């Protein structure tokens, strides 16, 4: 997927930039939140080709690169999924401990209903990257995103499916 190539290169550049900006501080905290985690499109138990595996791999790699440059970085991932079957696969994968150097959690439910819990999880000190890639047509509008958009030290990558936008 093109979006995964974009996500990987963007996330790596962003995390390394934010991490290096914190050099000299006791610790850099970088959070990644996948608001529509899935997994989708992968039957592989390692979830290869999903944003889940990609984000964990990228954050683990960035943590190692930052450590080699003298930056102590805490990497955290949060995955939100409302589909019960997909959430079960996600939860099982995360419990296996792949990329253990990255802290990870998953919340079952719709990200809209969980916005305040997501913000509590993010805290106020760390930098947070939100990946918003809805499965199918989901009206992701400013009013829905407002609580997240108002959080300081945050960045967003929102995937819009052209065909859905073109139909409106």
Role assignments for model-derived ranges:
Residues 37, 134-135:
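Conserved Walker B
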Residues 115, 119-128, 135-168:
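Class I S-adenosyl-L-methionine
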Residues 9-118:
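SAM cofactor-binding core of SAM-dependent methyltransferases
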Residues 3:
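Hydrophobic (often cysteine-bearing) scaffold residues that line and stabilize catalytic clefts
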Residues 78, 131-133:
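Short catalytic-loop micro-motif centered on adjacent basic/acidic residues
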Residues 6:
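Charged catalytic carboxylate motif
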Residues 32, 128-130:
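Receiver (REC) domain switch-region micro-motif
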């Amino acid at each position: 997927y093109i979006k995964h190539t974009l996500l990987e290169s963007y996330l790596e550049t962003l995390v390394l930039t934010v991490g290096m900006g914190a050099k000299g501080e006791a610790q850099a905290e970088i959070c990644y939140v996948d608001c529509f985690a899935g997994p989708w499109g992968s039957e592989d138990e390692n979830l290869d080709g999903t944003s889940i595996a990609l984000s964990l791999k990228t954050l683990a790699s960035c943590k190692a690169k930052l450590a080699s440059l003298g930056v102590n970085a805490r990497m955290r991932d949060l995955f939100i999924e409302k589909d019960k079957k997909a959430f079960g696969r996600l939860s099982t994968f995360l419990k296996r401990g792949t990329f253990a150097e990255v802290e990870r959690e998953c919340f079952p439910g719709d990200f809209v209903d969980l916005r305040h819990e997501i913000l509590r999880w993010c805290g106020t000190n760390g930098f947070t990257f939100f990946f918003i890639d809805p499965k199918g047509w989901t009206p992701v509008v400013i009013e829905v995103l407002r609580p997240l958009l108002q959080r300081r030290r945050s960045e967003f990558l929102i995937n819009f499916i052209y065909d859905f936008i073109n139909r409106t």
